[in-house]
Amino acid sequence: MRVLGVDPGLTRCGFGVVDGGGGRTVTPIAVDVVRTPADLELSSRLLRISEAAESWIDLHRPEVVAIERVFSQHNVRTAMGTAQAGGVVALAAARRGIPVCFHTPSEVKAAVTGSGSADKAQVTAMVTRILKLAAAPKPADAADALALAICHCWRAPMIERMARAEAAAAEQKRRYQARLAEVKKAGTR
């Protein structure tokens, strides 16, 4: 499974591609950070991020795009910019029919380091070790993008099993409600 991991941000947006093999085998394909100047208009910054995402998707052909979920930050303005950057990346993937999965920072940290409260240095060290890289990816946004891709490779089987279980439960509920409606209808005759 080829995964494009994206650590969204307006100033620095990390992109990392890995191929996931059997078990926990992951192979690095590419990593980079797209920067946008703070003095550009918001729309121009988002356009640059969108164009970069489209380029990465077209070049690397991922089967899924994994994006960091923004759930809260102390700085509302930063959180909004991060969410907007993630949104344009998700849109670029959706336009190409590629599924998008969002993972929280604690899910990514737990998957890669074993601790949901790991710091950036621990995440970078584990990404470097897992991918057998000669040097740590820099800046941290690059390492985070690779961590997102690794996280998705490792969590995808569980996510698929849960989706199947939820679909089966929904179908069972639908059949039960249909049967219940039949019984009620027969009882009113």
From Swiss-Prot:
Top-rank lineage group of the source organism: Bacteria
Record has RNA-binding as a keyword: no
Record EC number: 3.1.21.10
Task performed by this protein: The RuvA-RuvB-RuvC complex processes Holliday junction (HJ) DNA during genetic recombination and DNA repair. Endonuclease that resolves HJ intermediates. Cleaves cruciform DNA by making single-stranded nicks across the HJ at symmetrical positions within the homologous arms, yielding a 5'-phosphate and a 3'-hydroxyl group; requires a central core of homology in the junction. The consensus cleavage sequence is 5'-(A/T)TT(C/G)-3'. Cleavage occurs on the 3'-side of the TT dinucleotide at the point of strand exchange.
GO MF term set: crossover junction DNA endonuclease activity; DNA binding; magnesium ion binding
Catalytic activity, reaction form: Endonucleolytic cleavage at a junction such as a reciprocal single-stranded crossover between two homologous DNA duplexes (Holliday junction)
Name of the protein described by the UniProt record: Crossover junction endodeoxyribonuclease RuvC
